[in-house]
Amino acid sequence: MASWPELIGALLARESLDSARTAWAMDQIMAGAATPAQIAGFAVALRAKGETPAEIGGLIAAMRAHAAPLRIPDEIRARAVDTCGTGGDRSNTVNLSTMAALVVAGAGVPVIKHGNRAASSACGSADLLAELGVAIDLPPAGVEACLRAAGIAFCFARIFHPAMRHVGGPRAEIGVPTAFNILGPLTNPAEPGAQAVGVADARLAPVVAQVLADRGTRALVFRGDDGLDELTPTTTSTIWVIPGGQPSAAGEAAGQTAAPPRREQFDPRDVGIHVPDIAVLRGADAPHNAAVTRALLAGEPGPVRDTVLLAAAASLVAAAGPTDAAITEQIAAALPRAAHAIDSGAAAAVLDRWTDASQAAAAAAAIAR
């Protein structure tokens, strides 16, 4: 039987925990059985020791066990991609990954985006979508209805992971990034087959990549070398390339992990994109960011479009399954498809269908209550 003194003591002794023990800790937290001091002590000790993929895997397993169920048909789920990143880079850019989600859906790839309201910025993905007219607090049936009608859906973390409310206070009071900061992109309740994940914390980016590789997810994990949790348009980015493929049951039972993801450097200038100053991507409140989003969908050129195209191209590469080719070549090949989704009006049409479908689903849910 695990205990908090045992787990925190082991971490302070710089001993890594197996997934069963971190799953126990997360189960206690999700059940409301852990005190704020225990939650904070565990998170800080884990960070000080350095998180491993197995430890993160245990946290994810317990968090999923407490989540509201969402069952997306396999033929859709397997093709779908999530563009959710970790946030926390303190750059206060506009909602690049959310805009990229609309572009990817406009290119014909199903998108199941996991997200929440703002934590470290003025406008989170949920804030932006609500401002654009999307009903965000939908039950599972509403999420699936949006996916079928518009090719895109939003899983609001507060709806599907209500037990995470126990983490909010200690996390805010600690004030430094911990493992809790990376769980959002790794706990999408729909479990899409592909992900494009920006990670702000340089320590945790390779850990996130290995977790996704062990899961068999097709993915690109990236971090701008300027600290942005995006493919930055200002300088180089580091990308971890994960082709995906289901791990074998025998391998999982033996505790084997997938091969380490391939690490590459990406320079946006190699695909014809360069933004000299990140300041031109600064966002503000939800009305401002919504106006920027609508301008993008209307075809407005400029640094926001260029940066969103990079993000959308990365998501398209992840959805298709990264190959052995250099990642720069793969992103370059996907850029025209992303641009066409905007210029043809397809991405804007996705937003129109999504707002209609989500509002209808919200009305149906209200009647059912």
Curated annotation (Swiss-Prot):
Residues where Mg(2+) 1 binds: 97, 230
Binding site for Mg(2+) 2: 229-230
Record-linked InterPro entries: Anthranilate_Pribosyl_Tfrase, Glycosyl_Trfase_fam3, Glycosyl_Trfase_fam3_N_dom, Glycosyl_Trfase_fam3_N_dom_sf, Nuc_phospho_transferase
Pathway assigned to this chain's UniProt record: Amino-acid biosynthesis; L-tryptophan biosynthesis; L-tryptophan from chorismate: step 2/5
Residues holding anthranilate 2: 171
A GO cellular-component term linked to this record: cytosol
EC number(s) reported in the record: 2.4.2.18
Bound cofactor: record note: Binds 2 magnesium ions per monomer.
Keyword Chaperone: no
GO molecular function per UniProt: anthranilate phosphoribosyltransferase activity; magnesium ion binding
Transmembrane segments: none
Cofactor: Mg(2+)
One Pfam family recorded for the sequence: Glycos_trans_3N
GO BP annotations listed: L-tryptophan biosynthetic process
Reaction(s) catalysed by this chain's protein: N-(5-phospho-beta-D-ribosyl)anthranilate + diphosphate = 5-phospho-alpha-D-ribose 1-diphosphate + anthranilate
Chain residues that bind anthranilate 1: 85, 116
Stored Gene3D superfamilies: Nucleoside phosphorylase/phosphoribosyltransferase catalytic domain, Transferase, Pyrimidine Nucleoside Phosphorylase, Chain C
Record key words, sorted: Amino-acid biosynthesis, Aromatic amino acid biosynthesis, Glycosyltransferase, Magnesium, Metal-binding, Transferase, Tryptophan biosynthesis
Binding site for 5-phospho-alpha-D-ribose 1-diphosphate: 85, 88-89, 93, 95-98, 113-121, 125
Family: Belongs to the anthranilate phosphoribosyltransferase family.
Subunit structure, as described in the record: Homodimer.
Entry function: Catalyzes the transfer of the phosphoribosyl group of 5-phosphorylribose-1-pyrophosphate (PRPP) to anthranilate to yield N-(5'-phosphoribosyl)-anthranilate (PRA).
Name of the protein in its database record: Anthranilate phosphoribosyltransferase
Organism from which the protein derives: Frankia alni (strain DSM 45986 / CECT 9034 / ACN14a)
The encoding gene: trpD
